[in-house]
């Protein structure tokens, strides 16, 4: 369900079918203020509502996401075993989920997470442009730099995939990154 009014429409249809104490979970990229409003709507009907930030992309879909639930008091004890079973785990085995708090806190934390991620992506783009246009570096040389950074304090998924993208050549020895349009779209979740 797309974030925004479609969530409200489905919630309006779903609520009459539920029983007191049931939990509704919004795992989309909803605005935290919308989550606050939906909590009030549900609690007025005896329901619990959880707004849960979900992170992990394709890897998270395959191996478990990082989850950031927040919402109605009392909901966590009901959903905790399920969320812990499906969440990603760290290399040391710690589960990648924790109750963030009441209200729209889960979606608020996801909004902050997205803002940091968008900032990181912009820094990577700016660095790429300086290396390519300012320093005249080749894709292979840039890939090696990102590879070194990924073995240190800057170790991250975004640095890793940037390294891999810059190193990739097709069967004809062409690096597709040289043909990617220098433009980006967005779904609107970064506007808040």
Where are the regions that the model predicts?
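Glycine-rich, N-terminal phosphate-binding loop of Rossmann-like dinucleotide-binding domains
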Residues: 1-2, 28
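Intrinsically disordered, low-complexity terminal tails/loops enriched in metal-binding residues
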Residues: 15
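Rossmann-fold dinucleotide-binding core
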Residues: 6-12, 25, 31-143, 151-174
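A conserved active-site cap/scaffold subdomain adjacent to cofactor or substrate pockets
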Residues: 177-192
